């Protein structure tokens, strides 16, 4: 495949496999000319779907494999028996430089384990992080980590801040994102030692984003900052809580607006406004969670995503592949190292001054 940008796709991942993946590709192509696809999985099933979407068929190469990773498969099992599966082959295509990014709607734990095994961690980075794109009052906030690491020390939280800011810049277009550390209060003395230490490091270092300081849980929905950084345990609990609340309110609104003739009339009158609200809160608009920190781009689509949602994940992967976000991460890691060296040596120069000099 000779085109410059190729996306490798696990066509068997998710709850619906090719029946969602292929229509998702067809939708994504409307806004992504010049992108081609490697589709890994059951060749017959993929070809049957491609026959319904000639545009997607014209830019896709099918690579048949007999195995697929189950949605309930444990990461250890996936690594033992995963070689030759659609997920494994999709990630491996990135390592072999056949594709610039991989998208899968498969098992999150298995995808993380296989991706780490095949691609390895990027230089100078300790841990990967999973990103969530969070609809807010002001647009979209990037939240990480939302499940890759149960615990994170100060240096890892700082790395998440650097990776999250680079991602937000690449995908959401903010030239200089604002970053906050999730905490139980905004005062310097609040929170765990790891969070306070990360706060001190970020405050003292000049990076390609603006560090806001501590933020609280309600600041996520307010959109107080562009990027919210936390450990994977806290981030995952926050994400699942928000998803549950969204379903609750959606069901309550639907139940209330169909509770009687007057309520139904009110719903009809407000249908335009309700449609706008539904669009704003539609999770498919913000689907696509990259596994940051790897030597390659891997984007996780929600397993239950529809074609719109899968198209969104493809757009995230494409935006990352076309950006210089990895160079931005490397640049900020060098500034961080320079700041630490300046503080340790006590040479009397400001940390921001030294760090800035490294990047010039």
UniProtKB/Swiss-Prot annotation:
Catalyses which reaction(s): a fatty acyl-[ACP] + phosphate = an acyl phosphate + holo-[ACP]
GO cellular component: cytoplasm
Role this protein plays: Catalyzes the reversible formation of acyl-phosphate (acyl-PO(4)) from acyl-[acyl-carrier-protein] (acyl-ACP). This enzyme utilizes acyl-ACP as fatty acyl donor, but not acyl-CoA.
EC number: 2.3.1.274
Keywords, ordered alphabetically: Cytoplasm, Lipid biosynthesis, Lipid metabolism, Phospholipid biosynthesis, Phospholipid metabolism, Transferase
Protein name per Swiss-Prot or TrEMBL: Phosphate acyltransferase
Top-level taxonomy: Bacteria, Pseudomonadati, Pseudomonadota, Alphaproteobacteria, Caulobacterales
Native species: Caulobacter vibrioides (strain ATCC 19089 / CIP 103742 / CB 15)
HAMAP family: PlsX (MF_00019)
């Amino acid at each position: 495949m000779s085109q410059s940008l190729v996306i490798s796709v696990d066509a068997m991942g998710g709850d619906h496999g090719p029946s969602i993946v292929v229509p998702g590709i067809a939708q994504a192509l409307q806004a992504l000319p010049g992108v081609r696809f490697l589709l890994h999985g059951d060749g017959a099933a993929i070809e049957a779907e491609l026959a319904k979407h000639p545009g997607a068929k014209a830019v896709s190469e099918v690579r048949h494999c007999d195995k697929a990773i189950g949605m309930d498969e444990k990461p250890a099992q996936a690594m033992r028996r995963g070689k030759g599966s659609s997920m494994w082959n999709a990630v491996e295509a990135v390592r072999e430089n056949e594709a610039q990014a991989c998208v899968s709607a498969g098992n999150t734990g298995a995808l993380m384990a296989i991706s780490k095994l095949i691609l390895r961690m990027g230089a100078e980075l300790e841990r990967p992080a999973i990103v969530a794109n969070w609809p807010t009052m002001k647009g979209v906030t990037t939240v990480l980590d939302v499940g890759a690491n149960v615990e994170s020390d100060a240096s890892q939280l700082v790395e998440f801040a650097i990776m999250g800011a680079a991602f937000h810049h690449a995908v959401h277009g903010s030239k200089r994102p604002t970053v906050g550390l999730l905490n139980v209060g905004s005062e310097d003395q609040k929170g765990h030692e790891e969070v306070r230490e990360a706060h001190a490091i970020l405050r003292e270092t000049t990076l390609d984003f603006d560090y806001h300081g501590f933020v609280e849980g309600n600041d996520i929905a307010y959109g107080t900052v562009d990027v919210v950084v936390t450990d994977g345990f806290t981030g995952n609990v926050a994400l699942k809580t928000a998803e549950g609340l969204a379903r609750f309110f959606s069901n309550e609104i639907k139940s209330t607006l169909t509770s009687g003739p007057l309520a139904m009339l009110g719903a009809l009158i407000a249908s335009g406004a309700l449609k706008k609200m539904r669009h704003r809160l539609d999770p498919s608009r913000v689907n696509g969670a990259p596994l940051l920190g790897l030597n390659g781009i891997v984007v996780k689509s929600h397993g239950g995503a529809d074609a719109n949602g899968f198209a969104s994940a493809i757009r995230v992967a494409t935006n990352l592949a076309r950006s210089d976000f990895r160079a931005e991460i490397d640049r900020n890691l060098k500034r961080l190292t320079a700041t630490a060296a300046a503080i340790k040596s006590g040479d009397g120069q400001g940390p921001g001054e030294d760090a800035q000099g490294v990047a010039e």
